[in-house]
UniProtKB/Swiss-Prot annotation:
Catalytic activity annotation: 7-phospho-2-dehydro-3-deoxy-D-arabino-heptonate = 3-dehydroquinate + phosphate
General function of this protein: Catalyzes the conversion of 3-deoxy-D-arabino-heptulosonate 7-phosphate (DAHP) to dehydroquinate (DHQ).
Protein name: 3-dehydroquinate synthase
Residues holding NAD(+): 71-76, 105-109, 129-130, 142, 151, 169-172
Required cofactor(s): Co(2+); Zn(2+); NAD(+)
Gene Ontology MF, one: nucleotide binding
Coiled coil region boundaries: none
Family: Belongs to the sugar phosphate cyclases superfamily. Dehydroquinate synthase family.
Primary location group: cytoplasm
Length: 359
């Protein structure tokens, strides 16, 4: 088992990574002992892992209950958030309760936001079950729900007390979901770690085969990078914004196509290629860098082009609502090479239109 610490002074917490962690009562004991616990999961994950996790938690917790939500980005809304609050209130959960997110990024975001809001803040644990949530969304305290006019527009920064990543979950993860998670892995290589990027190029087959050593290595490295960035810039005033590479374009794709039709990682993959194309257009990188990025994304069966139905106007209406917009200026995360990126506002509408039109 690997352990990584997210260093945030009195709000620091550990990330545990390895196989067979769902049975490890000692991992959960410091957070749940003697507490009432509500496990939040979805209709896909609950039949696979809810009983196992509930049994482990019950060994130390005073009581364990659960609420099961529908599975999908389209259910990441205030209406379904209220189902968590209903379960907490109807069950008379007090301020010393613990919420547990058992699922992917949607469940993690919603559970974390519920924990941030319920009685002005209760403890929660992240148990991410998808590759995307294991390498990205479960770490760092971003919590939110979507609004019809924009993704993650209603949320809070609120850190978990513990993250437990059991890699055995990946054995039940559909191939499309695994690929979507690899988009976020590739992102880390582009923005911060050229050695990771090269390692990914050399280990595509091992990762697709779920080789245990390869999987643990890549999850741990991504969590290390995320922990470093979050420790330096928790509320995204500076370097943390780089973690949004591909996300401004990607969120526009998700919103325009309807949440759930394109997976988040698929949209981010296409968005990273668009960001790299923008860097080429602005003279920030050579086209060979764009080709490496696109080739690695394609190697994991991810899209490298935006939907044909989307033109400049359908992108820009969503991009203008991006959380990185400052003073009315659109700001994009753009690669400066493999292992480096910057937040830039230098791309004009004409240049973006050229990038979006490009086949």
């Amino acid at each position: 088992m690997k352990q990584i610490q997210v260093d945030l002074a009195n709000r620091s917490y550990p990330i545990h990574i390895g196989p067979n962690l769902f049975e490890d009562q000692e991992l959960f004991a410091p957070v749940v002992s003697g507490k009432k616990v509500l496990v939040v999961s979805n209709e896909t994950i609950a039949p696979l892992y809810l009983d196992k996790i509930s049994a482990t938690l019950s060994a130390r917790a005073a009581q364990v209950a659960s609420v099961i939500l529908p599975d999908g980005e389209q259910y990441k809304t205030l209406d379904y958030l209220n189902e968590i609050f209903d379960a907490l209130l109807e069950g008379n959960f007090a301020r010393d309760c613990v919420l547990v997110a058992l699922g992917g990024g949607v469940i993690g975001d919603m559970t974390g936001f519920a924990a941030a809001c319920y009685q002005r803040g209760v403890d929660f644990i992240q148990i991410p079950t998808t590759l995307l949530s294991q390498v990205d969304s479960s770490v760092g305290g971003k919590t939110a729900v979507n609004h019809p006019l924009g993704k993650n527009m209603i949320g809070a920064f609120y850190q978990p007390k513990l993250v437990v990543i059991d890699i055995n979950c990946l054995k039940t993860l559909p191939a499309r979901e695994f690929a979507a998670g690899m988009a976020e892995v590739i992102k880390y290589g582009i923005i911060r770690d050229s050695e990771l990027f090269t390692w990914l190029e050399q280990n595509v087959s091992a990762l697709k085969a779920l080789d245990q050593d390869a999987i643990i290595h890549v999850i741990a490295r991504c969590c290390e990078i995320k922990a470093e960035v979050v420790s330096e810039d928790e509320t995204e005033q500076g370097v943390r914004a780089l973690l949004n590479l591909g996300h401004t374009f990607g969120h526009a794709i998700e919103a325009e196509m309807g949440y759930g039709n394109w997976l988040h990682g698929e949209a981010v993959a296409a968005g990273m290629v668009l960001a790299a194309q923008t860097s080429v257009t602005l003279g920030l990188i050579d086209k060979s860098i764009l080709c490496r990025i696109a080739a690695l994304i394609q190697a994991f069966d991810l899209p490298v082009q935006a939907p044909e139905s989307m033109d400049f106007n359908s992108f820009i209406k969503h991009m203008r609502r991006d959380k990185k917009v400052l003073g009315g200026q659109l700001r994009l995360v753009l690669p400066l090479g493999i292992g480096a990126a910057e937040v830039s506002s230098q791309a004009s509408d004409a240049e973006l239109a050229e990038v979006i039109r490009r086949p």
